[in-house]
């Protein structure tokens, strides 16, 4: 029963479900029918709308094209506007507002580039022509502004301003010499390390303006115009500065015609001028050039070379004329001074005149240094030969130190003030030997050449005693001078001792030659009695009074003659003079005292003894003290 009821219920539900499905199918069929109807309508609508879509796309593209055209037109119009602005600034000129003027030129270049890349515009050619014409005008004004600005601030430097830049030790003295220190103070170690203050050639505020102008000219391709303007302006000013300082343009012929005193002064000035020119003027010029042409190194070097070449040539040509002039001993020291300054300035010259463009200038400076060194060496060699061959007829009648001796010794002593330079010469241009030994060797040869010449000059004396006195004086002067100078360290003690012995030998020879005869007159030798007997053992009883009187007369005559002659002779050195007098007295006075003691009584016992015994030993000693004083012939005895 229960099962049947469940089956009935289940059957009813199946009927309901079938009815629902059928209804749902009907709805689905209806929906499909409706959707199909919509699809047909939509297809028809799409077909109807297609022409409208095409027209809309075309309109959109047209709008985009219009936008692009408007934007391009705006750019073109802006370029025209910028061109008008640039033209206004260009026509106004760069003088009042250089920065704005340079901006206008930069803008013109951009405008030209723009129209060059957009030549499709109808007006592009006309605009380009106008812009290029405007740019050319702007650059011309720029060039003129550079020229005027550079000229306005380029003035010759007054000497006082240059002197202010020197270290105190190198400034001219306040007595108005103006030409600087003489070359005699030749080598100053402080000069190489002292601080120099560069003169202000162009105000620092102007340099950036000149740099900007130069940069624009380079960018415009006007390097040659720039170079010419800068060279003409600055080279003229530099030469004027040197002329105000005292530098002259002198040819070799001018130098050769000058008197030595005048030339020597000019050489001293030249040394001072070289130091000022290199360390102040050329260094300052390089600094200015590098700042104006910053970023254009090769152009900077070229400009600097062309600005300075004439001034450098003016200075070096004088040095070259001296180096090539006829050699003479007195020129050696100025040649060494000139060589020293060129060596002192070598580092600065290499630094200031850097770069390929300045190569010729550097080579010229190096060439002058070498020529000065070579000429100095040759002059040094000439001096040795000149000393040995000196044939001056200067007579030294009193046997004193010959002018040649004092000249040579002073020359050698002066050389030792330059020994550092001479050693450098031997080191750089010698044969490789030690520079000390080379200097010593040359000095010894000069001294030997002097001795050889003095030997020749001594033969002019007819009196052999004066010959030895002359050689004694001169060699003693050499020895004394060497002992008191740095030459002693170079020549050595052996040289000094050897030549002291030579001095003593000549003193001994003088004494022997001059006083032997009178010593014989004051000896007992040759005194015999009237009977022919000889004097023996100090006994004077057999001596002929007449012969004895003659012997005294002979002594008096000989002494008078010796005194008169030798009191006119000169021994200039006090110590040597006293020692020579003492040496004569030591042999003459004992002999005379002995002779007078033994034979004086015989003469005194006769008539007029004072006629024969003219001198006491004390008289002789006093008169010997008058020897070698260089008295005139008519000067009375004391």
UniProtKB/Swiss-Prot annotation:
Compartments, as annotated in UniProt: Cytoplasm, Cytosol; Cytoplasm, Cytoskeleton, Phragmoplast; Cell membrane; Secreted, Cell wall
Family matches, as InterPro entries: Cullin_repeat-like_dom_sf (IPR016159), Exo70 (IPR004140), Exo70_C (IPR046364)
Annotated GO MF terms: phosphatidylinositol-4,5-bisphosphate binding
Chain positions covered by the region annotation Disordered: 163-190
Main localisation: cytoplasm
UniProt keyword Transferase, yes or no: no
Pfam families associated with the record: Exo70_C, Exo70_N
Keywords: Cell membrane, Cell wall, Cytoplasm, Cytoskeleton, Exocytosis, Membrane, Secreted, Transport
GO cellular component labels: cytoplasmic vesicle; cytoskeleton; cytosol; exocyst; extracellular region; phragmoplast; plasma membrane
GO biological process annotation, one example: regulation of secondary cell wall biogenesis
Free-text disruption phenotype from the record: Dwarf and sterile plants with decreased apical dominance. Branched inflorescences due to ectopic initiation of lateral inflorescences instead of flowers. Altered polar growth of root hairs and stigmatic papillae. Reduced cell expansion and aberrant xylem development. Aberrant deposition of xylem secondary cell wall (SCW).
Self-association and partners: The exocyst complex is composed of SEC3, SEC5, SEC6, SEC8, SEC10, EXO70A1 and EXO84B. Interacts with SEC3A and EXO84B. Co-localizes with FPP3/VETH1, FPP2/VETH2 and COG2 in vesicle-like small motile compartments. May interact with COG2.
Role, per record: Component of the exocyst complex involved in the docking of exocytic vesicles with fusion sites on the plasma membrane during regulated or polarized secretion. Involved in polarized cell growth and organ morphogenesis. Involved in polarized cell growth and organ morphogenesis. During cytokinesis, involved in cell plate initiation, cell plate maturation and formation of new primary cell wall. Participates in polarized pectin delivery required for the polarized development of the mucilage-producing volcano cells of the seed coat.
Family: Belongs to the EXO70 family.
Record protein name field: Exocyst complex component EXO70A1
Gene designation per UniProt: EXO70A1
